[in-house]
Amino acid sequence: MPVSVITTVLACLWLSYRLYKFLTIPVSSIVSTLKIKTPPATKVSIDKIATDSVTIHWENEPVKAEDNGSADRNFISHYLLYLNNTQLAIFPNNPNSLYTCCSITGLEAETQYQLDFITINNKGFINKLPSIYCMTKAREANEALKTRKWRRNTITSSTAMQPRNSKSEPAPLPSHYSSVSLSTFSSNITNSATSNNGSNLPAYTSLTTLKDLDSFSIDDLKKILICAQEDLHDVLSQQTSLLQDFQESKLELELELDNLKTHWSHEIDLRKSLKSNIKSLENSKLLTDLKIEKLNKKIDKSKEKISKMRNDMQKWSQEDTELLSKDTIKEKYFKLLNESNASVANINKEIESLQNEISKMEESNKRLNASKKSLITSIVVNANVENDKPIASGELSAVLKKLNDFTLEKNGFLSNAGEEFLSKLNADSSLIKMIKQELSIDQELEANWKLQRSNLLKKISALENQFNEMSLNNRNLKTKLMVQPYKNNGDSLAATNSNNSAEKNRSSGSIQLPLSNNMSRTGSIDLISNNNKSINNSNADSAPPLRLHNPVSYSPSNEPIQPSSSLLSQLTQDTDNRSMLSNHISSNNENKQQPSSYSHALPTTATANATATATATNGHSRSNLWTTAQFAQPSHQQVSTELDQAFEYDNANHLISGLQNMIYDETDYPDNISNYSKGFTTDELDNYWTKQQPQVRSTNESLFSTTGTPMSSYKANPVISPYSSSHLRQTSNATNTNPMHPQSLLAATLNDPSLQSFVRSGSFYSAPQPANSLQNNINGNETENISPRISSDFNLLVPNLSPRLSNDVPIVPGNNTTLTPSHSNILTMNHQPTADNITRRSFHASSPPFNSIWNSNTNQLSPPLEEQYHLDVPVGPKVPAKEPSPKPSHKRNQSNSSISSAWSKFKHKSASSPANADTDIQDSSTPSTSPSGRRMSKLLSKSGMNNLFNPHSHDS
């Protein structure tokens, strides 16, 4: 029982809650969920509100057509108009008209009314906008006068005129507001007149003249005047009211006209918009028509294609049914099977026949191979027998002659025809074996030569160190001697001449002494150092006066004087180290130490420093010859690239003039030749030095510092520099009238008494002997005075001073370390004197490309010896030289494994003497030779000559 009650209560609560929720559902949500199509709401516009009427209008809804052509079923069917919740009228929807107007009349003034407008569709659904509230206008007081109707005059008949003597007063006129009263008023007057006077008063409107008033009494006139005044006031009031009505109606009409104008403009705009819409619709219609036509065409084409495809599919289905039948497939299969079996049988038959042929061919090949092996063995045996036989001399000479013809003379290469001929030779022939043997011999000789060269380079480095030490000692001693003042004696010239003659005798006597075999270069250097120390001690103790040599007292070039051992060792040391020294010894102080008077006249080649003779006070005959020769060497780059070549000259005193003439003949690169070398000969230079006036310079300028490295001290030492001799000459000439005669290094070396025996005895450059050419080629006169040990050491240290064959020999300083004995016999000399006493040289080469010596190619520069063998030699600044334009050159293949290079070496050995074959191998690591295969002297090369005559002031 309680459970049922509880459930009933819960059910009632649930139902009430659901009812509440259902009632609170908005109508819009219900309409949207049920998808009810309600009619659209129509807006009502109020046009005019009057005191008793209201005018409204609204737009009619046009009927919309659906896609299927039928009319829309949800269009508005009619409208309902309510006034104060009271239905006034039902207006149907007229889609043909745009607006519907309605005027509600019979309303009260100043009363508020509620207007409701409801739209209903054909299904009965309604839609309503919010209600419209409006109030009518108030009614005015003089509204009765504001009428367009004129009030007529109510007095239609004239009243009877009373006589003047009548005493009865007329009755007062009633008001004009009421015609009835007026008409009553008239009827009363008439009755009183008839009753009183028995006649009616005329109307005052008929009284138009004054004569008409004569019959009336004053009272009557008063009454008429009052009535006229009342009428006049009435007319005036009507006039004012009419004017007001006119103004109001005018304003209303103007406003209405403005409204109509705006309405008309709206109508025009609407028409324009409608026209534009119509045009756009027409255009869209045309576009849609075109699209429809295109689509119809596409549809027609697609239909045609579909029909064709259907027909094709039907045909294919028929063909498939015909072709895929089992009977036809079986027939085709059996046909193909029979054909394949027949082809297989034919192929098997062909294979069997081919196998039989192959077996026959293999048997025949085996027989042929056996016969071939037997023939090869017999041929090899015969060839070995023939190769073991020595080649006939005639055949060998013919082969060598052909190869010699095919060899190029300039570079030793084989031509293409020669390489083809060499490749055709049998590799097992005795000629090839002989060539290989010669190559092995050449390689062994080359290895020995390299070993000897490395030993010589080590010796040269040791000698350079000794030279540096000696130069330091020499410089210290010279500074002490140079600082001492010179004594001005009257017999300086005679003393100098006597000293020179005594010096000649002493030098000739000392050079003729036998030399011991154990004497070495170090011994001679020690001898010079001991002499220097003795002179230093004597100068420190006694400080004897110094006398400079007279150039006239120098020994002539044709007088034979034997060199002493000390000078010989000094010369060998100076000759070995000259090639290793740089030209920076004298290049840095040229412009600083050169006087202004010699700025353009002083030659920049090389000058001999002052030669001083120290004479002891005790009258001893012992003297020491101090000779320091400085030579402007070319840069290391030029020294390393140019190779030495031996030449012979008939007169060494005119070497510079000969070089100058050769420079004039060389016109390939005239820009590289200095202008200073175009105006001087040897005689002119000698005359210049003898005629030059001395210039007095203070002794303080000759002082110099003795500190620094041995090689760098040359730069700061004015005495050792090439121009220091001129300063020394000027200082000495301040007290001595005998001028100095400085010479170049070449002339000073040739005029040195210690070298006269070498100058007069024969040539330094001659052909080597078959045996030890460096030690056993000394003439009989030399072997009597010089021991074999000294001669061998001298030849090793000075390779240019080889045994002599000719009469007049120049000493050519050069890169002596790269000269090989095999090239010493390349050139010979013919002596041809000229009219101007300057000897011209005509060089006769042993091969056609002799002129290429003067056109050496300097494009491929090899490193200097110091860089190649890592020698610790002080190197000065390199003077940049102008590189000539490149000329076509032939690069030789220096590989020992090359057939052409090996054959060229063999060819050179076979063409020269047997002794040359042992010494003709060149080091592949050494600088390359000239295009003609010959080495040139560094002094006689083009760059050497340019550096000889080129002023150093231009290189700075």
Swiss-Prot record:
Region feature Disordered, mapped onto this chain: 152-173, 488-600, 875-956
List, alphabetically, the SUPFAM superfamilies matched.
Fibronectin type III
Ranges for the Fibronectin type-III domain?
40-141
Q: Where along the chain is composition biased (Low complexity)? A: 524-543, 564-574, 895-904
From the record, give the cysteines joined by S-S bonds.
none
The PTM Phosphoserine maps to 501, 520, 802, 842, 895
Q: Which residues carry this modification: Phosphothreonine?
A: 154
Question: What top-level branch of life does the organism fall under?
Answer: Eukaryota
GO CC term (a single one): endoplasmic reticulum
Keyword annotations from UniProtKB, A to Z: Phosphoprotein
Q: Which InterPro entries match?
A: FN3_dom (IPR003961), FN3_sf (IPR036116), Ig-like_fold (IPR013783)
Q: Where is the composition biased (Polar residues)?
A: 153-165, 488-523, 552-563, 578-599
What additional remark is attached to this entry? Answer: Present with 149 molecules/cell in log phase SD medium.
What is the protein name given in its UniProt record?
Uncharacterized protein YEL043W
